[in-house]
Amino acid sequence: MIYEFNGFRPVVAESAFVHPQAAVTGNVVIGREVYIGPGAAIRGDWGEIIIEDGCNVQENCTVHMF
């Protein structure tokens, strides 16, 4: 799921795959050909997170910016 937070909505490249059971929140940029697995949480609620082209975030990983 993609969630807006404090006026920031994640930007996801068309060629990226975000699993329906993943959570992407706030100030997040997901590049091309990126894979976000089930249970992953990418929380850009207090700062920007950039997942660059070709990267992957595997199952149940958390990426959080304070």
Regions found by a protein language model. Name each.
Residues I2-R9:
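A detector for short, charged/polar N-terminal pre-domain segments
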Residues G44, M65-F66:
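Extracellular beta-strand-rich solenoid/capping regions of secreted or surface-exposed proteins
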Residues P10, S15-V18, A22, V28, ...:
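A structural motif detector for beta-strand N-caps
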